[in-house]
């Protein structure tokens, strides 16, 4: 009797990816975030689909259509807040997932890592366009400020911005195209995630030691399926606590005011998950310089494989690198805090120092620490 799980063309793919997949026996809870990201993506696509059924992408009716969803549609309020806070959970999982990759040296799987970086950019673009759709004050001014950064590009900048806007300012054309892109991109993300998984399964998972685990593997099911289910339950618990008790905790009160091109909010800022990059952008007094710093900030993960100087893959046995890694985490949290503060005395200098520290840590100190640790191994 041939097992259908191993013979059926479709079941075989599922089996090789989620059931009989040989997995390292020692991967910790830091390896849960991949499956959690998959759950977040499915949740966002489903809630987004139901929101799109009632949303209208027109400047005159967008704001009131979101209000209509919250007030008149059956369970519309919970769908809307699950979608908004689901994005926050998505980014928490994303940053944890990337942080895990940096700590344990997973970036040495080049194809998997590069597809992952592309995924990160695509999710960021999708989230930015989604934030514009409710057409509140912060939606409008956020879209204006961020798209306007492209005007810093020499020669073609202004034309490029007007092309993206579909006019001479953020208006109906901009909102319509952002809605179209926001709808299609999650499906592209889902396809990219499958490619990400495909490349990962070519090499197998990394593990906390950074040493090959080919001599000692266990099947994914039941060991890691049950572990992933626990992770999923905790994720859904956290999300629902946020949705049901503090749905507006991570949002901006300005977005409950309809978009008004004639009235600029006192502090324009993006959602919390972009604040670290926004802080670096603001800390440079020159427009083009700020834009370049912003691009460099989010390009850093791509450089990681090139900057790896250590003979060991993981940071598990590298105390100096561990120390620098946690300083980097603290630095990113500092930047996130600064990005949400007004541009005035103590915050400006803190932001500039934290920005310098970010680039210094990644480009200079961490590779140096790797080399020092290599020399210490010789003793």
Curated annotation (Swiss-Prot):
Gene3D superfamilies: Cytochrome Bc1 Complex, Chain C (1.20.810.10). One of its GO terms (biological process) is mitochondrial electron transport, ubiquinol to cytochrome c. Its cofactor is heme b. Binds 2 heme b groups non-covalently. The keyword Repeat does not apply. InterPro entries: Cyt_b/b6_C, Cyt_b/b6_C_sf, Cyt_b/b6_N, Cytb/b6-like_sf, Cytochrome_b, Cytochrome_b_C_euk/bac, Cytochrome_b_N_euk/bac, Di-haem_cyt_TM. One of its GO terms (molecular function) is ubiquinol-cytochrome-c reductase activity. CDD domains: cytochrome_b_C, Cytochrome_b_N. Heme b b566 binds at residues 97, 196. A ubiquinone binds at residue 201. It is found in: Mitochondrion inner membrane. Keywords: Electron transport, Heme, Iron, Membrane, Metal-binding, Mitochondrion, Mitochondrion inner membrane, Respiratory chain, Transmembrane, Transmembrane helix, Transport, Ubiquinone. It is a multi-pass membrane protein. The keyword Membrane applies. Heme 1 (or BL or b562) is low-potential and absorbs at about 562 nm, and heme 2 (or BH or b566) is high-potential and absorbs at about 566 nm. Belongs to the cytochrome b family. Component of the ubiquinol-cytochrome c reductase complex (complex III or cytochrome b-c1 complex) that is part of the mitochondrial respiratory chain. The b-c1 complex mediates electron transfer from ubiquinol to cytochrome c. Contributes to the generation of a proton gradient across the mitochondrial membrane that is then used for ATP synthesis. This is Cytochrome b. The gene is MT-CYB.
